[in-house]
Amino acid sequence: MSNFFKKLVKKDGTPKSSRKSKSESPVGKYDMNGNQVVPDTASSYSDDSNSLSDSYDKRGEPNIGEQIDTLDDYNFGNEIGDAESAPEDKKSLWKKVGGLVGKDPMSLVSLPVYFFEPLTVLECQLEPLRFVELIEKASTCSDSIDRLMYLTAFNIAVFSSYTRTAKPFNPLLGETFEYIDKQGRYKSFCEQVSHHPPIGIAQTTSEIFDLQQESWITTKFWGNSLDVFSHGQNHLYLNSTGEHFTWKVPSAICHNIIFGKMWIEHYGDLIVENHNTGEKAIINFQKSGWFEGTQRKVQGEILDSKGNARVHINGKWDKYVKAKKHSEGPSRKSSGEITLWEATIEPPENFNKWKHGKWIQGLNEMSKEYQAVLPSTDSRVRMDRIYLEREENKLANKEKNKIEEREREKRKTRESRKEIWKPNYFSKREDSKYGYRWDFNGKYWDERDKRVDSVVDKFKNDPNFDSNKIPEYDDSKLNISVKSVRKFSRDFTNSSTPTQLKRSFSKLKLEEQPQSQSLPPMIKEELSSSTVDHEETFYSESNEAKLESIKEDANSHTYIYSSPTIGHSGR
């Protein structure tokens, strides 16, 4: 057995752990005067009623004991000066990771914090929303090829964020993150729904679109490089047309991890598909060659439902995306080239040491008022992340080790009790077309509303409390009042699409705000609401149905949808 693996096991062959919790650290909470509150660290994730411990330990997760390599208990940080800074001699690091060749090190080892940036994977999932204007532009296009063209540009532009080489923190099981756009255009919620494999789901809702992103990444270590493979699904619905888009993203390689200057390369095919029209974009991210001109280059075609090339796409994923349209006729003449997207250059002073610009830095912004309403599961309040952001690396590394040790103990407890852990806000179901889908139950935003009301009421007489510093999203344009449908259902008999119906609802003065529920094509589960004399139910079997008409008699009304059928009846 090599010296490396001897360090990982005891004499009896069982894995040994080098992680030890030696000290407690303050929690990043503040009172309304801006003074830091210093309870025991564990309360941040264990003692609160909304904490990971109380919310998730009772639920358990699938038995994964056999999936954990002995390397799971090996910690580099303790042998590198508590990871205060990167080791000068990278050869010493190679001695520790050399045995990982061909393995997935991200799931097998605990890395020191000098490898990290003060973000979690959940936060990074929302970085594509930096380019939300391209989705909004697509929604205004009258031609489906044009819509696909701008959504393709959106999916290329997002890679301009992925040049940083620092690693985000892995979310804990059940960890969450919320984000509300400062311009009020959308709201997003993320939850870590699985630990092995690591899967996080992000659900973004706006008046213009609904987007669900699944982060599911595996890696393979090759000595001085790391392959990164993405397996997650991405679903986008444009509310103006009811169109459903999905995409698959290319792979990546992180070069020169041990020796040389680290850099990231994306390669392979990006495929964006419109499931309503059958149109598809196939864009190739080219591998770098010997010459600089080939670096970060992309090119490909947008195809119509018959497989004919309609648009040629080219560019560099970190700089620009251009398009040249082909005519539909026999001549196949091309139009002039247009620029779909061009990177905005931020001034150097906008960036921090991790190369985060203003938008990315905004993901971690939280006033004391905002922090008061965040749940203890939110990525912003993780103390290892906070300490790293403050550049207190020694404390960050100790806190990270404590959190990981606590999570392993909770996992072992669940396994011993044979408990099955379930996410709080998403549920997984089988899907005949996509294999599976994740359904968002909307409860997080209801819980948040209650927290906001409670905090605002508690500090309403405090002159230092400014409720305007708590981000809010105007849900009136999204929510519907189920109990009020019957008395105004006749107003919608001419509605021809779910979007028109949705907009009609949004103009009403609602009597109450029930759980936010999107109308088709985003209906995902049964929703029922009842009063003393009235009951209504949504039934959903498809995401592609369109509203055809509404029929009503003295006792009931029925919404008629195109095949495959979705029925909605009330009595």
Curated annotation (Swiss-Prot):
Keyword Coiled coil recorded = yes
Q: Which residues form a coiled coil?
A: 387-420
SUPFAM superfamilies noted in UniProt: Oxysterol-binding protein-like
Which keywords belong to this entry? Answer: Coiled coil
Low complexity composition bias: residue spans: 43-54
Q: Does the keyword Coiled coil apply?
A: yes
Matching Pfam families: Oxysterol_BP
Transmembrane stretches, by residue range? none
Q: Which residues lie within the region annotated Disordered?
A: 1-73
Assigned GO CC terms? cytosol; membrane
**Composition bias, kind Polar residues: at what positions?**
33-42
- GO molecular function (one): sterol binding
Q: Which InterPro entries match?
A: OSBP_sf, Oxysterol-bd
Question: What family does the entry list?
Answer: Belongs to the OSBP family.
Q: Which PANTHER family match?
A: OXYSTEROL-BINDING PROTEIN 11 (PTHR10972:SF202), OXYSTEROL-BINDING PROTEIN-RELATED (PTHR10972)
Protein name, entry field? Oxysterol-binding protein 11
Q: Which organism is it from?
A: Dictyostelium discoideum
What lineage does UniProt assign to this protein's organism?
Eukaryota, Amoebozoa, Evosea, Eumycetozoa, Dictyostelia
